[in-house]
């Protein structure tokens, strides 16, 4: 009987389908693949953004007015490589490809998927819109309604919306009567599979990779935390003050001020009674003295349109 040597291609053919089965977040967002090789970790590639058009009322007298097709790009740093490393001796006990699949490929694919899901879910730190109460697990239909309202206000396209919930929120939702009794509209999936399904225009999924955010310790000894001094519109540096202000702000902390929501983009600490933090999106004009609200530690469940995020990959040279 001829010897059979397992090659890298055979591993890939077996592992990739199993990896895709375990992926959650990347399968719900925009994906950018290319055959162009990346030479090394940290390379920057340009990813095309969808073309945006503006519609107008047709005027027969003016005739057709063509719109320019402008393709814009965004730079993405390929700064993450997920890997599962196993010594050759650990694979030598396998006597067939089926053994290799059971002992190594399937567990490795699951581990890689968990790593990729967790890295993707860390993007919550860049999301500034938020609803609900920090530290309180969403457990009513109002959570869906408020998330839908936030997406509508941001003019997110209606089709393709999705939501990822942590196990606690998922358990609370699957016990809701309107979801349990969804069989009245022809579906028994919620009852038999424990699946939330599509609610209020969003496809809902559970993921153990949903992140828990630990907020910074910024606090004032008494009174409110307020904006310190005037700020011009368009800036990203927000200065806060308060009575005997102490503590820190962490990347991903949520700040509400002047009717807007912002996320902290870099860690910051109090110095000389004030704290200067970088935020997104750009600030409006502030006169100073505006009251600031800080969200506490919370679970970062996500509701989004697929075009809000992108999963970008490139092959590495052998």
Each language-model region and where it sits:
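N-terminal "assembly arms/tails" that initiate or stabilize quaternary assembly
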Residues: 1-74, 78
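Surface-exposed ligand/attachment interfaces on beta-rich extracellular proteins
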Residues: 31-36, 133-142, 146, 231, ...
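Long, contiguous amphipathic alpha-helices that act as assembly "spine/axial" helices in icosahedral shell
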Residues: 47, 74-143, 152-168, 195-204
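Conserved "cap/hinge" positions at secondary-structure junctions
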Residues: 49, 258-259, 296
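Short helix/loop capping segments that flank catalytic or ligand/cofactor-binding pockets
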Residues: 55-58, 86, 96, 172-175, ...
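Signature of extracytoplasmic/envelope-associated structural regions
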Residues: 107-136, 217-224, 243, 301, ...
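Autoprocessing Asn-cyclization modules and mimics
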Residues: 172, 177-287
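Glycine- and charge-enriched low-complexity intrinsically disordered segments
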Residues: 274-318
């Amino acid at each position: 009987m001829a010897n059979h040597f397992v090659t890298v291609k055979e591993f890939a053919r077996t592992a990739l389908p199993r990896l895709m089965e375990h992926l959650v977040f990347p399968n719900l967002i925009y994906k950018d693949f290319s055959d162009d090789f990346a030479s090394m970790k940290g390379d920057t590639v340009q990813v095309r953004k969808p073309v945006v058009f503006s519609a107008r009322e047709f005027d027969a007298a003016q005739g057709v007015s063509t719109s320019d097709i402008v393709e814009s790009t965004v730079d993405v740093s390929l700064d993450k490589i997920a890997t599962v490393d196993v010594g050759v001796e650990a694979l030598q006990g396998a006597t067939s490809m089926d053994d290799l699949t059971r002992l190594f490929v399937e567990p490795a694919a699951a581990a890689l998927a968990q790593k990729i899901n967790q890295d993707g879910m860390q993007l919550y730190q860049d999301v500034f819109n938020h609803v609900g109460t920090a530290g309180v697990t969403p457990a009513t239909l109002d959570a869906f309604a408020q998330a839908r309202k936030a997406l509508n206000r941001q003019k997110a396209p209606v089709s393709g919306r999705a939501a990822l919930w942590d196990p606690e929120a998922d358990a609370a939702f699957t016990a809701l009567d309107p979801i349990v009794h969804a069989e009245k509209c022809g579906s028994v999936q919620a009852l038999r599979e424990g699946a939330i399904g599509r609610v209020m225009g969003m496809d809902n999924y559970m993921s153990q990779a949903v992140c828990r955010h630990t907020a910074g310790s910024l606090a004032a000894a008494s009174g409110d935390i307020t904006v310190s001094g005037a700020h011009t519109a368009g800036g990203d540096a927000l200065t806060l003050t308060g009575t005997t202000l102490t503590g820190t702000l962490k990347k991903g902390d949520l700040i509400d001020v002047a009717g807007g929501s912002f996320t902290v983009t870099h860690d910051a600490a109090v110095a000389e009674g004030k704290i200067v933090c970088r935020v997104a999106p750009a600030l409006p004009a502030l006169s100073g003295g505006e009251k600031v609200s800080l969200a506490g530690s919370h679970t970062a469940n996500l509701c989004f349109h697929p075009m809000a995020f992108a999963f970008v990959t490139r092959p590495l040279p052998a």
